A protein has these predicted regions:
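Catalytic Walker B motif of ABC-type/P-loop ATPase nucleotide-binding domains
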Residues: 162-165
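Conserved ABC ATPase signature
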Residues: 137-141, 145
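Conserved ABC ATPase "signature" region
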Residues: 71, 103, 114-132, 181
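Helix-to-loop junction immediately C-terminal to a conserved catalytic motif
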Residues: 53
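A short, proline-enriched helix->beta-strand linker immediately N-terminal to the Walker B motif
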Residues: 156-160
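Conserved ABC transporter NBD signature motif
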Residues: 61-71
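ABC ATPase NBD coupling module
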Residues: 70-84, 114-115, 188, 230-231
Length: 246
């Protein structure tokens, strides 16, 4: 993994009215890192991801992307093309085929011509095992298939960083494995990824950096071995014990 910082979060805060959801968050992501953010529901994990993608506007602090404070950016679509997000609810266009779903962002944001967009879309749909379904509409697909299309769509945009917001939480249990395998294969390509997940075995296997959040703060971060085998924070220990017991 590189020591080059891609994303640096400094003193990040986010409140919804009186409810402070993120409380002075500080951590950084190096190029090539696969970072898994874990913690109980309501700990602020998804809000943090949405702030990084500017879907939520932070209340305070800085988010540096390649050294630039993105909270001062004037071109949010260009930034989001570099820091793409895979949503738990897929966010596919229901009226478009699988192929069109993977082409439209390239054409509108990257200004790719039709042939180039189609070539890239086909390449990544093949990679996630969805090439046979290029003419299908999302309603004809299973949840696992929809998520694989959503991942291919993001990969086709050639992003610098990919954010995954609980990518398996909306799936039937039998579909979870196929999506996790796709994400593992992407991690092996050396892409920079931040993954919010409740899948502890997956987090341990796929990441080189684990962040544990509790009640809007980062309690602890480290390598998977440090977090899963020798956690220091009492909240981390309690959280992992609950998972082991379940």
């Amino acid at each position: 993994m590189s020591e080059e910082k891609v994303i640096d979060i400094i003193g990040l805060k986010k409140s919804f009215g009186e409810n402070e959801v993120l409380k002075n968050i500080n951590f950084s992501i190096n190029r090539g890192d696969v970072t898994c953010i874990i913690g109980s529901s309501g700990s602020g994990k998804s809000t943090l991801l949405r702030c990084i993608n500017l879907l939520e506007e932070p209340t305070g602090g800085k988010i540096l992307y390649n050294g630039q404070n993105i909270l001062e950016t004037k071109n949010i679509p260009a930034y989001r093309a570099k820091v793409e997000m895979v949503f738990q609810s897929f966010n596919l266009f229901d009226n478009m085929t699988v192929l069109k779903n993977c082409m439209v962002g390239q054409q509108k944001v990257l200004k790719a011509d039709k042939e180039k967009a189609k070539k890239e879309a086909m390449y990544y749909l093949e990679k996630v095992g969805m090439a046979p379904y290029i003419n299908a509409k999302p309603r004809q697909l299973s949840g696992g298939q929809k998520q694989r299309v959503a991942i291919a769509r993001v990969l086709a945009m050639k992003p610098d960083v990919i954010l995954f917001d609980e990518p398996t939480s909306a799936l039937d249990p039998q579909m979870v494995g196929e999506v996790l395998e796709v994400i593992k294969s992407i991690a092996e390509l050396g892409l920079t990824m931040i993954i919010v997940t409740h899948e502890m075995a997956f987090a341990r296997d796929v990441s080189n950096h684990v962040v544990f959040m509790h009640d809007g703060v980062i309690c602890e971060e480290g390598t998977p071995q440090e977090i899963f085998t020798a956690p220091k924070c009492p909240e981390t220990k309690a959280f992992l014990t609950r998972f082991m017991n379940n």
